[in-house]
């Protein structure tokens, strides 16, 4: 298995990133999909594709949040599956706008739905990226109780991404405290996973951080707000907070 992994790494000549987009990004702060918002994000991704191989994991919070639905009395597993289906709707919306922007795109789903998406196969995803296509991963891990942050870390490791890019709404990086509650909170340009876990920083999922730490994968937490931030993050420009092992 090690030989296969090494051969994949040696074949990879361009920077390869895994971009995590929250469901809230697709809704523009509302329920459902906001076409103008998704079109804008797609254009930013398209601008970076000629230079970088891009895979994307999307959330589904603009439709359903399994944990919140379960608090209302719904079975957690069933609620999580509803959330997974919501991510696939976001995948299809982003695929449409990326292809309108001239970027070949493939959707891979962890839950089989052959009419709208390919099955999730890591090696096929890698080949798509090598051919200049964007790959969007939907349906989370295909299992309940896994956040899409954790799925982003897992997919990044499976497709041998160089970095995980966590795009956030309403915050431009990691702070010493919640900047909305503490006016003295300071933004951190760099942070180790050990420090983030010790401080119990909640801007990203702790399981995802542990997975990245254990596998020496760098994460960048950055804000969606700001002209061209997604393009800049994909290209590797300095912004947000860099979290390293």
Swiss-Prot record:
It is an enzyme of class 2 (transferase). Inhibited by UTP. The keyword Lipoprotein does not apply. GO terms for biological process: 'de novo' CTP biosynthetic process; UDP biosynthetic process. ATP binds at residues 20-23, 61, 65, 175, 178. InterPro entries: AceGlu_kinase-like_sf, Asp/Glu/Uridylate_kinase, Uridylate_kinase, Uridylate_kinase_bac. It is found in: Cytoplasm. Pathway: Pyrimidine metabolism; CTP biosynthesis via de novo pathway; UDP from UMP (UMPK route): step 1/1. This is Uridylate kinase. The gene is pyrH.
């Amino acid at each position: 298995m090690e030989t296969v992994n090494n051969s994949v790494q040696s074949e990879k000549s361009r920077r390869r990133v895994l971009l995590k987009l929250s469901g809230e990004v697709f809704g523009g702060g509302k329920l459902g999909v906001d076409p103008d918002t998704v079109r804008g994000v797609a254009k930013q991704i398209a601008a970076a594709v000629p230079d970088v191989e891009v895979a994307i994991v999307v959330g589904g919070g603009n439709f359903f949040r399994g944990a919140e639905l379960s608090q209302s009395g719904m079975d957690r597993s069933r609620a999580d599956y509803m959330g997974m289906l919501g991510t696939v709707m976001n995948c299809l919306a982003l695929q449409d706008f990326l292809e309108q922007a001239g970027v070949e795109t493939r959707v891979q789903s962890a839950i089989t739905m052959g009419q709208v998406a390919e099955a999730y196969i890591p090696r096929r995803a890698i080949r798509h990226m090598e051919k200049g296509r964007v790959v969007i991963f939907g349906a989370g891990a295909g299992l309940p109780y896994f956040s899409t942050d954790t799925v982003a870390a897992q997919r990044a490791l499976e497709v041998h991404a160089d970095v995980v890019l966590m795009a956030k709404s309403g915050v431009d990086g990691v702070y010493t405290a919640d900047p909305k509650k503490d006016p003295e909170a300071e933004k951190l340009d760099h942070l180790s996973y050990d420090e983030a876990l010790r401080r119990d920083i909640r801007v990203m999922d702790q399981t995802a951080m542990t997975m990245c730490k254990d596998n020496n994968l760098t994460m960048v937490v950055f804000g969606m707000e700001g002209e061209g931030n997604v393009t800049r993050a994909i290209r590797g420009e300095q912004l947000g907070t860099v979290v390293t092992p």
